[in-house]
Amino acid sequence: MRCGLRGLTLVGLACLAGLAVAQAPDGGGFLQPGYLNLVDVILPAPIAQEPRGVADREIFKSTRAMKGSERWTMAIGDVPSDPASMMRGFACAARVPMTPANAPKTVALLEKASRDTASETNQLKSYYKKKRPFLLDPGETCEVLSDEYRVSYDYPSGHATKGWTWALVLAELLDDRAAPIMARGRAYGESRVVCGVHNMSAVEAGRMVASSTLAVVRTEPAYQDAVVAARRELAALRKIGAAPSAQACSAEEAVVNQPIYR
């Protein structure tokens, strides 16, 4: 924790008392719950009849035509957000065959940082209570819509938040692969638009939540120590692990780089 952050009065007092209030308890993220409040940082959720809302609805309608395409298939593959699935999803971009078993320090870092960013996203979802796109306009989705989807909120996107969190952290760990890693993180969030379960504004807000939260998380000594350990782990894995198939990765990159709207 850095004691010079403005606007956090309780934190400032705790610094004077020598208390590290930003550090979360075991099992949480790197920050204490409630340490941040991003309501004034993230743009308000769009209103359906206003310009941002109209753009969301048009993008939702136009991307329904992607059903059956390679981009639609990628969106289906991006639905699972468990660590093993996400490591597979980023393996080509990273050029490292990561798994929770062979990179435990890396996955622990990614998941711990993701708990911080998810906490902020969940607070904003509850604050704005924005309906998902398929509740406003008809259109097919790439996954079965459970009751949980129908009663949960659109803005910001939790998947986009987590995907961008992973991308930013992995880019820090593997800086020579930063551009393709961040491109994959962008595409991971956009998959929710292709899938039809989130609006584009929700994906953009999810990225902003991840970036804003990580700006503070990165000041934590525990995070910095975890980065050093994960970087060493991935460097060792690069030396002994077989890189993902170049042909398969080339095909994936072509889909990642495909714009979903103009």
Name what the model sees in each region.
Residues 214-262:
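C-terminal membrane module of polytopic membrane proteins
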